């Protein structure tokens, strides 16, 4: 059966040789063009004329010429990378060009005229790595997160998963589940249908140990807080200094500040990185009773919803009215007198008083909401599949009937396959690899 056409490129096939600019848009000091597929070696032969192909995995300076006429295109560093030990698992080549627009365009155009070559679609190099088994779905997702990472915490988490932290555990679990299933099948095969021997204690102990490891992974924190930021809501009555404090934390004028009460009527969000950790700061409408303004009433209602969904609430108001668990801030400390004993912090966004202490407090609170050193946060997809794996192992452990134990182990294998992407749907894969840029 021929390879299926690719979703984003009508008529294209997964057996084509693909190429793309994989470095930043020119002009630049160097432009890197990647080629992957069965014709990668032929492509560099055509661009370099009759010269012998470079030694594998050694950079070689070569003149690149247009196959149609022989005009010199550039003098470039060329890398020949025969598969399968490459990023995509296929034959690959890299051209390190002078990074001008005209040079890059000329080389890409020359490649496009070679038979069997076509431009890559978004994420196609990574998809080929997945389809050849060089990476699994978790590593592909982590690579997408790494490319999107804007903070140190996001980078660290992506690197843990891209480095195979979860994938290694899954490979081990799959081996152990298969081993247990094989032992069980052998016992069933060599037993009379009406006289199946009970499972031996060693079998149950191995199953329990596996379940305990899965339980630990199921307890990992969600990655969404790392991706979207720790939600910090600034709340309190009108004119309490919420917008001024948000602007100071964000380092920009994200919210309008005036002496007029009720200036902020809707939620104003400002993403910010503090100490390498992502936060999502939210300014809210001033809370008070008896407003006759319908628009302001909607803003107050939304403020209440934001407070309920917050990870951290900074309360700028009467300490006695502070929501449970909130940080009581005595704001505008350069102009107002506060009872320091009733507040957690006294700050002034204008003078900077207490701002370092506030940032330190936010980082301390965030540390309890984010994964610890060496622990990876997991996506909703990963957590759901781990839950299914845990349920399957629970079935296998609770049922004394070997037939039902075998069914639990079968469901466990299916859950592991879903985690690694062996049982992924095309729509889900298309959505993932569409997050990548062309050339990755």
UniProtKB/Swiss-Prot annotation:
Needed co-factor(s): K(+)
Positions contributing to (6S)-5-formyl-5,6,7,8-tetrahydrofolate binding: 34, 94, 134, 440
EC number: 3.6.-.-
A GO CC term attached to the entry: cytoplasm
TrmE-type G domain location: 229-367
InterPro entries found in the cross-reference section: G_TrmE, GTP-bd, GTP-bd_TrmE_N, GTPase_MnmE, MnmE_dom2, MnmE_helical, P-loop_NTPase, Small_GTP-bd
Residues that coordinate or bind K(+): 239, 258, 260, 263
Residues where Mg(2+) binds: 243, 264
Binding-site residues, GTP: 239-244, 258-264, 283-286, 348-350
Keywords noted in UniProt: Cytoplasm, GTP-binding, Hydrolase, Magnesium, Metal-binding, Nucleotide-binding, Potassium, tRNA processing
Listed GO biological process terms: tRNA methylation; tRNA wobble uridine modification
NCBIfam families tied to this protein: PRK05291.1-3, small_GTP
Similarity-based family: Belongs to the TRAFAC class TrmE-Era-EngA-EngB-Septin-like GTPase superfamily. TrmE GTPase family.
Complexes and interactors: Homodimer. Heterotetramer of two MnmE and two MnmG subunits.
Protein name (Swiss-Prot/TrEMBL): tRNA modification GTPase MnmE
Protein species of origin: Rhizorhabdus wittichii (strain DSM 6014 / CCUG 31198 / JCM 15750 / NBRC 105917 / EY 4224 / RW1)
Protein's gene: mnmE
């Amino acid at each position: 059966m021929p390879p299926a056409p690719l979703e984003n490129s009508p008529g294209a096939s997964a057996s084509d040789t693909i190429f793309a600019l994989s470095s930043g848009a020119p002009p630049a000091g160097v432009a890197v063009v990647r080629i992957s597929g069965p014709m990668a070696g032929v492509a560099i032969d055509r661009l370099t004329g009759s010269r012998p192909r470079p030694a594998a995995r050694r950079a070689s300076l070569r003149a690149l010429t247009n196959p149609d006429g022989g005009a010199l295109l550039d003098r470039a560093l060329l890398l020949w990378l025969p598969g399968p030990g490459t990023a995509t698992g296929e034959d690959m080549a890299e051209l390190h060009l002078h990074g001008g627009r005209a040079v890059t365009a000329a080389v890409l155009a020359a490649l496009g005229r070679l038979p069997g070559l076509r431009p890559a679609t978004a994420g196609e190099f990574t998809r080929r790595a997945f389809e050849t088994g060089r990476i699994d779905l978790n590593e592909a997702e982590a690579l997408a997160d790494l490319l999107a990472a804007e903070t140190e915490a996001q980078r660290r988490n992506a690197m843990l998963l891209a480095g195979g932290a979860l994938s290694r555990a899954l490979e081990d679990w799959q081996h152990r589940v298969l081993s247990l299933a094989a032992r069980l099948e052998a016992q069933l095969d060599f037993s009379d249908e009406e006289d199946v021997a009970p499972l031996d204690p060693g079998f149950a102990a191995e199953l329990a140990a596996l379940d305990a490891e899965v339980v630990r992974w199921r307890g990992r924190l969600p990655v969404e807080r790392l991706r979207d930021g720790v939600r910090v809501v600034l709340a309190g009555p009108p004119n309490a200094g919420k917008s001024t404090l948000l602007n100071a934390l964000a380092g920009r004028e994200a919210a309008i500040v005036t002496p007029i009460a009720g200036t902020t009527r809707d939620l104003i969000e400002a993403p910010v990185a503090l100490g390498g950790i992502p936060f999502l700061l939210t300014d809210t409408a001033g809370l008070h009773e008896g407003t006759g303004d319908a628009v302001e009433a909607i803003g107050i209602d939304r403020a209440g919803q934001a407070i309920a969904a917050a990870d951290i609430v900074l309360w700028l108001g009467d300490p006695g009215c502070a929501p449970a668990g909130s940080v009581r801030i005595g704001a505008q400390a350069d102009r107002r007198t506060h009872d320091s004993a009733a507040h957690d912090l006294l700050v002034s966004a204008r003078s900077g008083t207490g701002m370092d202490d506030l940032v330190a407090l936010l980082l301390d609170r965030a540390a309890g909401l984010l994964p610890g050193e060496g622990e990876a946060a997991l996506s909703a997809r990963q957590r759901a599949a781990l839950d299914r794996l845990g349920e399957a192992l629970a079935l296998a452990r609770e049922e004394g009937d070997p037939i039902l134990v075998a069914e639990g182990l079968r469901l466990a294998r299916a859950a592991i396959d879903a985690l690694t992407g062996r049982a992924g749907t095309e729509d889900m894969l298309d959505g993932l690899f569409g997050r990548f840029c062309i050339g990755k």
